[in-house]
C-alpha cells in the first residue's frame, strides 16, 4: 500500500504518523508532501501498480487492527466504488466538513483525466485538495462510507483569525460546481462578457478562470487579454479545456490595463461587461444575480456593483478570509476619489462604455493605474450606478499587486482627475484587435 502523508509542516505531528505506520505496517511505502512537490508526487503515483492507495494527514494515527480490517474491506469493495471514506461519528466532525476519503482506487483516480495533486495555482486552498478530488470523482463513481474507530484523525485547532467555517462555506460551492460542470459544444449567445486582463499573473489565473467555469449560469463569454506576460501565462492558458465561450488575445507589447480593457470592450458580444481581475474570483451565483438585476435595470444604468469578500494573501500565498466588505449604496465622485474606495464587482453596460469611448490612455501613468476609478467617475456624470447589497466578488489583497506597489502615486492622479473641468473621452473600445 502506498500512503501519502499530507500537511507535514509540523515535525511532531509528522513524526507521530510515520512512527505509527512503521509500527503497524512496516511493509507500506510512505511518502510525505514536503514542500508540496506536485510533479514528484504525481510521478510516483503514475508509476504505482497497486489497486489502492491511502491518504493521511500528519498527526493521524491508525490502530493495530486497521491493516487486517482494511484487507477485508478492500476485498468486499464493489467495483463501482472509488474508495472508502472513514467516519468516526458526528461527535468528532469538525466545522461540518465532510471527511475526505482515506482509501482511493488507483484506476478511479487515473480515469479522472487530471493529476491527483493539483498545483497551488489551480486550488489555492491546500486544506481542500482531497475534497476537490472527492467531488470530481463523484460524477462517475460512488463512495463507500464506513463507521470506524481504527482511524484517529489529529484534532484540529484553528487560530481565532482563521474563520474556518466561513471559508469552507464559500469555497465548497466552487469545488462542487466545478466538478459537475459540462463544457458546451457550441457557444451560447452570451448575456454577459467577462473581461480578464492579465500581466504576469500565472500563479493566480487558473483559479479565477475556474470560478467562471463553475458559474450557475452558462450563457457567458470569457475574454482573456494577456498583456505580453513574461512568465508562464501562455503555458497555463494552453492547459485550459477547449471551450467555445473562451476567447484569448495576446498583446504584442505591454500596454497597460486600460488598453487591455478597451481591447476586451471591442471584442465583447454581450450587452454587459464584467471585469474580473486575474488574482480575484467569482462566487458561484455572481453572474446569475448580476443578470437578474440587469433585466430590471433602466437604460440609464451604466454600472452594477455589489459588496465583496476580502482575502489577504500571506507570505506563503495562503489566503486569510477577512469577511464581507460593504460598498456605499450611492457612489459620489468626490467620495470615491477621497477615499480611494474599491468597487467590486464592476459590471458595465457595454453601450454606456462605448458612449464615452471606453477607458482613457492619456491619463497620468498611461492608463496603467486607477483605471477603475476614472471609468466609474466618468460614467457617474452621465449615467446611473446601481448597487446590489450582496457580496458578488472575492477580492484578494496582496502586497505584490501593481496598485500596492504604486500607492504613493495616487495623490498626484487624484489631483489631476479633480482638475478636469470637462471630463475627457476614452481612447478605445471601437476598433477590434487583429488576431
Language-model features: locations:
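Short, acidic, metal-binding catalytic loop of nucleotide-sugar glycosyltransferases
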Residues: 16-28, 210-219
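Glycine-rich, basic loop-to-helix element that forms the pyrophosphate-binding segment
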Residues: 34-48, 251-268
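Acidic donor-binding loop at a coil-to-helix junction in glycosyltransferase catalytic cores
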Residues: 118-130, 365-375
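A conserved acidic beta->alpha catalytic loop
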Residues: 9-13, 34-36, 226-235, 253, ...
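Conserved donor NDP-sugar-binding/catalytic core segment of glycosyltransferases
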Residues: 61-94, 287-319
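Short aromatic/hydrophobic "clamp" motif used to bind/position activated sugar donors
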Residues: 53, 273
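N-proximal low-complexity "stem/linker" segments adjacent to membrane-targeting elements
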Residues: 1-19, 156-211
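A recurrent flexible, glycine/aromatic-enriched loop bordering the glycosyltransferase active site
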Residues: 86-103, 329-347
